[in-house]
Swiss-Prot record:
Highest classification ranks of the organism: Bacteria, Pseudomonadati, Pseudomonadota, Gammaproteobacteria, Enterobacterales
Assembly information from the UniProt record: Homodimer.
Organism: Klebsiella pneumoniae (strain 342)
Annotated active site: H37
Biological process according to GO: pantothenate biosynthetic process
HAMAP family registered for this protein in UniProt: PanC
InterPro entries per the UniProt record, alphabetical: Pantoate_ligase, Pantoate_ligase_C, Rossmann-like_a/b/a_fold
Sites where the protein binds ATP: 30-37, 149-152, 178, 186-189
Protein's job: Catalyzes the condensation of pantoate with beta-alanine in an ATP-dependent reaction via a pantoyl-adenylate intermediate.
Pathway linked to the protein: Cofactor biosynthesis; (R)-pantothenate biosynthesis; (R)-pantothenate from (R)-pantoate and beta-alanine: step 1/1
The family this protein is said to belong to: Belongs to the pantothenate synthetase family.
Reaction equation(s) it catalyzes: (R)-pantoate + beta-alanine + ATP = (R)-pantothenate + AMP + diphosphate + H(+)
Name of this protein: Pantothenate synthetase
Annotated compartments: Cytoplasm
Length: 284
C-alpha cells in the first residue's frame, strides 16, 4: 500500500494506472475509520482493480471551527486498517495541498436545493463543502466508481445529482448502513460518547424503527408521528434535533404518489450529534 500526500505524485500514479487500463475505485473519507468504512472498501475492491482511499478532514464542510478542531485525526491507525484490507493507495493530503490559496475565494461546487434543505438548513455551507471536495477528488483520482455510505442519505443524493449534472462518467455505489449489534449506526462521532451515553445511543434506532413500522402500516399522520418520536427521544436522554419524513426518491415532501419514504433522524447525545435513517415502503 502506498501513502500519497502530494497532488503531483497522485497524478503520476493515476496517469500510469489509466495507461494500463486499470479500473479505479475511490472511497472518500475523513479518517477515524471504523467497520462502516471497511464495508465501503470491500465494496470498492469488488468493483475495481485498484482502490484509492482518501483521508482528508475537509475544512470547507465544517460550519463550526470547534467541530473542525476536535474532529479525530487517526492517520496511523487508519493506514494500518487499510493495509490489512489490501488497499492500493491512500491519498492523505494536508489542507495546504488541497487548497493552496486557502479556502477563502476557493472555487466551489454547489448543488442547488439539496445543499440547503433538511440537514443543509441547519448546517450552512456544509454540503457546498462536501460537493466541492468530492468534485476535486473526482478530478484528481479520475475513478470509474466511487463508494459512499447510505448513513449520510442526503449527501449520497447530493453526490448522485452532482455526478449527473456535471457529466461525470463515474458509477456511484451506495453502501448500506453498518450497525453495532445493538443497532447503533457506526459513525466516527460515536467516539464523542461517554460510556453511559453509549448505552443510551441505540435508542435512536429504536425510535427510528418505531416510526418506520407506523408508516409501513399505513399511518400518514406525519406531524403526530414526528411529535411522538421527538418526545420518545427526549425521554430516553437525547435532545431531538431534526426528524423528517420525505419521499425516498426525491427528498421532497410526501405526496399521494409517493411509494417509499425515508425517515431522517438527528439527535444530540452529550457532545455527539447522531444521525440515522431508514427507508420504508409506505403502507396503504
Amino acid at each position: 500500500m502506498l501513502i500519497i500526500e502530494s497532488v503531483l505524485l497522485l497524478r503520476q500514479h493515476i496517469r500510469r494506472l489509466r495507461q494500463e487500463g486499470k479500473r479505479i475505485a475511490l472511497v472518500p473519507t475523513m479518517g477515524n475509520l471504523h467497520d462502516g468504512h471497511m464495508k465501503l472498501v470491500d465494496e470498492a475492491k469488488a468493483s475495481a482493480d485498484v482502490v484509492v482511499v482518501s483521508i482528508f478532514v475537509n475544512p470547507m464542510q465544517f460550519d463550526r471551527a470547534d467541530d473542525l478542531a476536535r474532529y479525530p485525526r487517526t492517520l496511523q491507525d487508519d493506514c494500518e486498517k487499510l493495509n490489512k484490507r489490501h488497499v492500493d493507495f491512500v491519498f492523505a493530503p494536508t489542507p495546504a495541498e488541497v487548497y493552496p490559496q486557502g479556502t477563502e475565494g476557493q472555487t466551489y461546487v454547489d448543488v442547488p436545493g439539496l445543499s440547503t434543505m433538511l440537514e443543509g438548513a441547519s448546517r450552512p455551507g456544509h454540503f457546498r463543502g462536501v460537493s466541492t471536495i468530492v468534485s476535486k477528488l473526482f478530478n484528481l483520482v479520475q475513478p470509474d466508481v466511487a463508494c459512499f455510505g447510505e448513513k449520510d442519505f442526503q449527501q449520497l443524493a447530493l453526490i448522485r445529482k452532482m455526478v449527473a449534472d456535471m457529466g461525470y462518467d463515474i458509477e456511484i455505489i451506495g453502501v448500506p448502513i453498518v450497525r453495532a449489534k445493538d443497532g447503533l449506526a457506526l459513525s466516527s462521532r460515536n467516539g464523542y460518547l461517554t460510556a453511559d451515553q453509549r448505552k443510551i445511543a441505540p435508542g435512536l434506532y429504536k425510535v427510528l424503527s418505531a416510526v418506520a413500522e407506523k408508516l409501513a402500516a399505513g399511518d400518514r399522520q406525519l406531524d403526530e408521528i414526528i411529535a411522538i418520536a421527538e418526545q420518545e427521544l427526549n425521554e430516553k436522554g437525547f435532545r431531538a434535533d431534526d426528524i423528517q419524513i420525505r419521499d425516498a426518491d426525491t427528498l421532497l415532501e410526501l405526496t399521494d404518489a409517493s411509494q417509499r419514504a425515508v425517515i431522517l433522524m438527528a439527535a444530540w447525545l452529550g457532545q455527539a450529534r447522531l444521525i440515522d435513517n431508514q427507508i420504508v415502503t409506505l403502507g396503504q
